[in-house]
């Protein structure tokens, strides 16, 4: 803590208080960073984004210059000669169009998902060797540039190379990139992956798979439309505090079906939430210990997420919008086994880390 205070004092003494980007706001006022990200004008102590930059062992003159561009005003404090600089603290927020299901009636219990029903669903394609490119995991679009998936989809197979993320996949066995429905031409959309950031505490050798979450930054922005749009993240405390047990959640993906073969088409299934303690007792026989950062969902005979669904979204509908609640992590060896639920990474527990990755690592 003393080191952080020293860094803050040093930075404040290095940055001319008059060197601003033309803003003169009050604490708590909305602002915009030079990159166009919405934020709030805050003192350094209230902005975890800035504090993490200051605490970086690689803090440099470049970072000082960058922090100077964030200055948005001054805070006058009684008994203090110099004002406290206010910085535009970026806030990650959901897209206004997130979670909207514009099209389609839903078809449940492992049936095909109608086009546009879950437009945030992503399919990850890998080079697995011998010039073979195949889909192996799922993901969920959360903004124009970022996709959430499971860490084991990027860490556990070091010989696999993640090539691109596909949206609006209608049939993996079809060679046609576009199809026509009701006189409308609808095409697959592929985006190269610029960077892969698995959670730093994920351990591929831990069979309990804690921290099984990963952020993919795409090489270019995704253009939203009726068939490709982001899902909402559970920033709202009211969403985070909703009950889990006996509530209904939806999983979507292209994983194995009841005949043990990958599905050519996107499917989804509805599953109930379970007591955490009960789930822990079920998996204890396999020496698996689950934390409060994991969710237990399912355990119905014949209905489950499965191999190939890994990294895909666990969703719930709240007030007409869809929220990303979990990420498919692991389950029983034989999918859909009665009383053996699937395990999912609890997204709400990782929102702070996600903000750090999406904002801080862009500049350090």
UniProtKB/Swiss-Prot annotation:
Localisation: Secreted
SUPFAM superfamilies to which the protein is assigned, alphabetical: Trypsin-like serine proteases
InterPro entries: CLIP, CLIP_sf, Peptidase_S1_PA, Peptidase_S1_PA_chymotrypsin, Peptidase_S1A, Ser/Thr_Proteases_Immune/Dev, Trypsin_dom, TRYPSIN_HIS
UniProt-annotated site: Cleavage, residues: 106-107
Keywords attached to this entry: Disulfide bond, Glycoprotein, Hydrolase, Immunity, Innate immunity, Protease, Secreted, Serine protease, Signal
PTM notes: N-glycosylated.
Induction statement: Induced by infection with E.coli or S.aureus bacteria. Induced by infection with P.berghei parasite following ookinete invasion of the midgut cells.
S-S bonds: 31-88, 41-72, 47-89, 137-153, 279-296, 306-335
Gene Ontology annotations of biological process type: defense response to Gram-negative bacterium; defense response to protozoan; innate immune response; proteolysis
Positions of the Peptidase S1 domain: 107-359
Disruption phenotype: RNAi-mediated knockdown in the G3 strain reduces survival following infection by E.coli bacteria but not following infection by S.aureus bacteria. Following P.berghei infection, the number of parasite oocysts in the gut is increased in the susceptible G3 strain due to a failure to kill or/and lyse ookinetes (the motile parasite zygote that enters the gut to form an oocyst). RNAi-mediated knockdown in the refractory L3-5 strain results in an increase in the number of killed and melanized ookinetes following P.berghei infection.
Tissue expression from the record: Expressed by a subpopulation of hemocytes.
Residue positions of the active site: 152, 212, 310
Superkingdom, natural source: Eukaryota
Domain Clip, chain residue ranges per copy: 30-89
Hydrolase as UniProt keyword: yes
Enzyme Commission code(s) on record: 3.4.21.-
GO molecular function, one term: serine-type endopeptidase activity
Cellular component GO terms, alphabetical: extracellular space
Described purpose of this protein according to its UniProt entry: Serine protease. Plays a role in innate immunity against infections by parasite P.berghei and by Gram-negative bacteria such as E.coli. In response to P.berghei infection, contributes to the clearing of parasite ookinetes independent of melanization, an innate immune response which consists in the deposition of melanin pigments on invading pathogens and parasites.
Free-text comment about domains: The clip domain consists of 35-55 residues which are 'knitted' together usually by 3 conserved disulfide bonds forming a clip-like compact structure.
Membership in a protein family: Belongs to the peptidase S1 family. CLIP subfamily.
Protein name: CLIP domain-containing serine protease B15
Organism field: Anopheles gambiae (African malaria mosquito)
């Amino acid at each position: 803590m003393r080191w952080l205070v020293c860094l803050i004092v040093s930075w404040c003494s290095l940055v001319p208080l008059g060197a601003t980007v033309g803003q003169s706001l009050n604490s708590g006022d909305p602002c915009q960073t030079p990159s166009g990200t919405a934020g709030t004008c805050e003192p350094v102590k209230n902005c975890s984004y800035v504090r993490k930059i200051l605490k970086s062992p690689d803090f440099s003159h470049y970072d000082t210059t960058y922090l100077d561009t964030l200055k948005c005003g001054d805070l006058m404090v009684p008994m203090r000669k110099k004002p406290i600089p206010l910085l535009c603290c970026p806030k990650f927020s959901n897209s206004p169009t997130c979670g909207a299901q514009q099209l389609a009636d839903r078809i449940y219990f492992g049936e095909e998902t109608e086009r546009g029903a879950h437009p945030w669903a992503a399919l990850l394609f890998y080079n697995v060797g011998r010039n073979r490119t195949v889909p192996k995991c799922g993901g969920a679009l959360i903004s124009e540039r970022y996709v959430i998936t499971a860490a084991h989809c990027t860490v556990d197979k070091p010989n696999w190379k993640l090539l691109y993320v596909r949206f609006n996949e209608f049939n993996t066995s079809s060679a046609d990139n576009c199809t026509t429905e009701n006189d409308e031409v609808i095409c697959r959309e592929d985006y190269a992956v610029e960077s892969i950031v698995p959670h730093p505490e994920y351990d591929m050798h831990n069979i309990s798979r804690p921290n099984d979450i990963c952020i993919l930054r795409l090489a270019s922005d995704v253009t939203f439309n009726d068939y490709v749009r982001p899902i909402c993240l559970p920033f709202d405390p009211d969403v985070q505090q909703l009950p889990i047990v006996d509530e209904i959640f939806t999983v979507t993906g292209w994983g194995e079906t009841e005949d043990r073969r990958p599905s050519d088409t996107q499917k989804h299934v509805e599953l109930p939430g379970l007591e955490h303690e009960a789930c822990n007792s079920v998996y204890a026989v396999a020496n698996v210990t689950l934390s409060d950062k994991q969710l237990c969902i399912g355990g119905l005979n014949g209905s489950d997420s499965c191999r190939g669904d890994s990294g895909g979204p666990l969703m719930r509908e709240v007030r007409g919008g869809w929220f990303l609640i979990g990420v498919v992590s692991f389950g029983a060896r034989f999918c859909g086994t009665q009383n053996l639920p699937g395990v999912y990474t609890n997204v709400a527990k990782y929102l702070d880390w996600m903000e750090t990755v999406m904002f801080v690592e862009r500049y350090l």
